[in-house]
Amino acid sequence: MQRIWISGYRGYELGTFGDKDPKITVIKYAIKQCLTNLLEEGQLDWVITGANLGVEQWSAEVALELRQDYNLRLAVMLPYLDFGSRWSENNQLKLQNLKNQADFWSATSKGPYQGGRQFREYQQFMFQHTDRALLVYDPEYPGKSKYDYEMIEKYLEKRDDYQLDLVDYYDLEQAARDYEGNQREW
């Protein structure tokens, strides 16, 4: 069983506005290309992601789309049980819809938010329950995913059977060109 942890920038870190922002389309296209390649090679069974607004929710949406054509499962993991409870009603509804459509969802901490320890435990869980990670993240442009990136880099020193794939800004520029080229062909 091959499992991938997907994370990356939050929507506000990328300056995305609304669900129809062209940047979201390009990011989802890049994620879809990565996942499709793994699926075609028989190297992916589960997408395991968080529920942060941004790359995590977009990757869950891509996994749900790919599930129509591939034997792919989606798990949405939360760092604590009431994650997202302070979001707007619309964003809470998006989270609930993702949880409803996922093959599995749970929280690594069964209580309400108590502190940073829950995020570290969440990271540890994600790393221990996946075989590779895909981060839409560029170390030259730090964001909240810096903590995931640094933790994975640290653990890679001890575990050589884990793989980290980065989709950085250069990769996103290439994905935008590829996406635009594919749209012209239609």
UniProtKB/Swiss-Prot annotation:
One matching Pfam family: YpsA
Entry's transmembrane regions: none
Record-linked Gene3D superfamilies: 3.40.50.450
InterPro entries to which the protein is assigned, alphabetical: YspA
Domain of life: Bacteria
Coiled-coil ranges from the UniProt annotation: none
Family, per entry: Belongs to the UPF0398 family.
Protein name: UPF0398 protein LBUL_0921
Organism: Lactobacillus delbrueckii subsp. bulgaricus (strain ATCC BAA-365 / Lb-18)
